[in-house]
């Protein structure tokens, strides 16, 4: 009987993603192929799902969009692609998704969500406010004879 339930669940996963092709596409992008109820979609195209049959911590997930802010994100997904209003629902800080209870506007929340820019030319690099302990040696500018 348990084997029948496992096979039934596997068949639901394949059909829930639109057949074998859709199942493989989702599996290779996310390394997981869960089936759940669609809770909502943000303005960037990320889709958020929930399945209460899964254990806590894996019962909510996101399927990322293939393009965000002009960047192709089909294979290059990043956790910072989730906007703050969905972040709090995704990490179980609240039980109400932003589709039912919108996030209150705050000054520090941007209207257009950005990626994490660490390791890119746009990253923030603070300038040093202290003198260096060791100074670099600058060779003389006159050429040797």
Curated annotation (Swiss-Prot):
Q: Give the subcellular location.
A: Mitochondrion inner membrane
One further remark on this entry is: In NDUFA12-knockout cells, complex I assembly is not affected, probably due to substitution by the NDUFAF2 paralog.
Q: Name one GO molecular function term.
A: NADH dehydrogenase (ubiquinone) activity
Subunit details? Complex I is composed of 45 different subunits.
Record family assignment: Belongs to the complex I NDUFA12 subunit family.
What is this protein identified as? Answer: NADH dehydrogenase [ubiquinone] 1 alpha subcomplex subunit 12
Q: Where on the chain is N-acetylmethionine found, per UniProt? A: 1
**A Pfam family annotated for this UniProt entry:** NDUFA12
The organism's superkingdom is given as: Eukaryota
Q: Name one GO biological process term.
A: mitochondrial ATP synthesis coupled electron transport
- Assigned keywords, A-Z: Acetylation, Disease variant, Electron transport, Membrane, Mitochondrion, Mitochondrion inner membrane, Primary mitochondrial disease, Respiratory chain, Transport
Q: Which disease is it linked to?
A: Mitochondrial complex I deficiency, nuclear type 23: A form of mitochondrial complex I deficiency, the most common biochemical signature of mitochondrial disorders, a group of highly heterogeneous conditions characterized by defective oxidative phosphorylation, which collectively affects 1 in 5-10000 live births. Clinical disorders have variable severity, ranging from lethal neonatal disease to adult-onset neurodegenerative disorders.
Task: Indicate the principal place this protein occupies in or around the cell.
Answer: mitochondrion
| Physiological role | Accessory subunit of the mitochondrial membrane respiratory chain NADH dehydrogenase (Complex I), that is believed not to be involved in catalysis. Complex I functions in the transfer of electrons from NADH to the respiratory chain. The immediate electron acceptor for the enzyme is believed to be ubiquinone.
- Mention any one GO cellular component term assigned to this protein in its UniProt record: mitochondrion
What InterPro entries does the entry give?
NDUFA12 (IPR007763)
Kindly give the membrane topology term recorded for this protein. Answer: Peripheral membrane protein
Q: Does the keyword NADP apply?
A: no
């Amino acid at each position: 009987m348990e084997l029948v339930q496992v096979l039934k669940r596997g068949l639901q996963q394949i059909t829930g993603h639109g057949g074998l092709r859709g199942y493989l596409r989702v599996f290779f992008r996310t390394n997981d192929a869960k089936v759940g109820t669609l809770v909502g979609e943000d303005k960037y195209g990320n889709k958020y799902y929930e399945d209460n049959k899964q254990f806590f911590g894996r019962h909510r997930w996101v399927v990322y969009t293939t393009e965000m802010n002009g960047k192709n994100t089909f294979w290059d997904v990043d956790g910072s692609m989730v906007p703050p209003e969905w972040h709090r629902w995704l990490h179980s800080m609240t039980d109400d998704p932003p589709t039912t209870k919108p996030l209150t506007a705050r000054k520090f929340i941007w209207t257009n969500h950005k990626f994490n820019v660490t390791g890119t030319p746009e990253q923030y690099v603070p300038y040093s406010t202290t003198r260096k302990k060791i100074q670099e040696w600058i060779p003389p500018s006159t050429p040797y004879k």
